[in-house]
Amino acid sequence: MVEEFKVTPWEVEGVVDYDKLIKHFGTSPLTEDLLEKTAELTKSELPIFFRRKFFFSHRDYDLILKDYEEGRGFFLYTGRGPSGPMHIGHIIPFFATKWLQEKFGVNLYIQITDDEKFLFKENLTFDDTKRWAYDNILDIIAVGFDPDKTFIFQNSEFTKIYEMAIPIAKKINFSMAKAVFGFTEQSKIGMIFFPAIQIAPTFFERKRCLIPAAIDQDPYWRLQRDFAESLGYYKTAALHSKFVPSLTSLSGKMSASKPETAIYLTDSPEDVEKKVWKFTLTGGRPTLKEQREKGGEPEKCVVFKWLEIFFEEDDKKLKERYYACKNGELTCGECKRYLISKIQEFLKEHQRRRKKAEKLVEKFKYTGKLAQEMWNEAIPEPLKRS
């Protein structure tokens, strides 16, 4: 990986240069033309995730739009590895996925990889990851997906995924997996097999698959694109998001393993206030006098970055806040108070919906229209013949 930063499916370190990452991964920039086409086809104003380039890169998104425009359609696939409670950084890509499902009217498959987290996390038992799976599913349902067009499945329960993974695994030799994921002689054999399971949902339909996810997950889809057509399927398409920074730094990404750096979806208003006041990195000057004279540096400020990514919907207000900071008209305390109120407002509504989600788990996993189809469907013929 490029020397200044590191991005893999398991860790992100340093301040990421996203332009360099596009070149390194061989993806394409998400251009204004593609965003305008998205707005045209959906007849909608773009959400802030697209307007502000939080999603910045893609593979074959142009072909997704072409398929939709010409009536072939597509489907969505994303997922969650249940290793602990979900935080703000985990949930934001799900809101982007919800917008895509809503506006394009397509099916969505959400894979809960309780098996992966057991294999990759030494400190977790399989019972732990299954328990976290249920907890995380409540947060995902609270986003507001269509229960008849969304199938949420746990790998440990939906064993059909294993039958699909076997022919996929036959297409991937160890050299390929090692080159993409950096496996070594110390890697558990379950870890080496797991990419086949994560790739399997890209073959759930004979349409092109679109995966909205953070760019650290791209290696899985690069591997799928190497052999998908030999199985009679499309190469999967992807939309890549940037990382949500932790409260304490603009480098790396928010981590559940460092509680002080993250806002969890179950945090209380008091938790939010305490964390933002105590831990959040700002772009302020050492003294109020300097702040007034020289102005702040919003480009170095986590508070501003969080408002930009998710918590300030109004573009005009965000721009005004940027220049008020640059001109020394705003103090860091004022911005922190504003962010605290925005986070508290979001979490209050999310937690209300999360409580209601308890009654919807069965529908998303087993009894909804798409869920029933998936439990009753046979393994696709091209995979059977492989």
Swiss-Prot record:
Any GO CC annotation of this UniProt entry: cytoplasm
Record-linked SUPFAM superfamilies: Nucleotidylyl transferase
Keywords assigned: Aminoacyl-tRNA synthetase, ATP-binding, Cytoplasm, Ligase, Nucleotide-binding, Protein biosynthesis
Protein known as: Tryptophan--tRNA ligase
Motif ('KMSKS' region): 253-257
EC number: 6.1.1.2
Family the UniProt entry places it in: Belongs to the class-I aminoacyl-tRNA synthetase family.
InterPro entries: aa-tRNA-synth_I_CS, aa-tRNA-synth_Ic, Rossmann-like_a/b/a_fold, Trp-tRNA-ligase, Tryptophan-tRNA-ligase_arc
An example Gene Ontology molecular-function term: tryptophan-tRNA ligase activity
Residue ranges annotated as motif 'HIGH' region: 82-90
Superkingdom of source: Archaea
Localization, UniProt: Cytoplasm
